[in-house]
Amino acid sequence: MRKIGIIGGTFDPPHYGHLLIANEVYHALNLEEVWFLPNQIPPHKQGRNITSVESRLQMLELATEEEEHFSICLEELSRKGPSYTYDTMLQLTKKHPDVQFHFIIGGDMVEYLPKWYNIEALLDLVTFVGVARPGYTLHTPYPITTVEIPEFAVSSSLLRERYKEKKTCKYLLPEKVQVYIERNGLYES
């Protein structure tokens, strides 16, 4: 069985925290690779103004292009409507029956697991990997593998706010992503 990590997210924008988590879990669990899974419409963020799929995908490509063990999975972008992890993983396990998927989530999502759509059936499809995030615990009634990572308190919402306030974001996200954001005037208002 191949071991593949999946890190889902809006990636609005992708930052060094995403890359750090993916890389740490890749090494800790001896994964073959990590797939970044950008969502179309995350159920817990419906109604929020999200940057276009095209821009988020371009930024994610720029952020991951130099790591050969990172790739981008477009499964959720090919569907309309909310992106439920269960639906996505059901499709991926059918397409890749030789893969054991490790679904990587932060502490915020570990606490949210009881509210996930079809969580009991999802547990049959993936192994959840929880990584600590400042302000959250990894306590859950569900079985998860935990991976300790260096604390790096950056979030996409923090970066959007910093751009809106015209503050520097240097060293918080890859330079190529920063250039893309500035050239395209993202997050200015």
From Swiss-Prot:
The EC designation for this entry is 2.7.7.18
Listed under catalytic activity are:
nicotinate beta-D-ribonucleotide + ATP + H(+) = deamido-NAD(+) + diphosphate
The GO terms this record gives for MF are: ATP binding; nicotinate-nucleotide adenylyltransferase activity
Q: Which UniProt keywords apply?
A: ATP-binding, NAD, Nucleotide-binding, Nucleotidyltransferase, Pyridine nucleotide biosynthesis, Transferase
Per the record's keyword annotation, is Nucleotide-binding included, yes or no? yes
What does the function comment of this entry state? Catalyzes the reversible adenylation of nicotinate mononucleotide (NaMN) to nicotinic acid adenine dinucleotide (NaAD).
Matching PANTHER family: NICOTINATE-NUCLEOTIDE ADENYLYLTRANSFERASE-RELATED, PHOSPHOPANTETHEINE ADENYLYLTRANSFERASE
- Identification of the protein by name: Probable nicotinate-nucleotide adenylyltransferase
What is the source species? Bacillus cereus (strain Q1)
Question: What gene makes this protein?
Answer: nadD
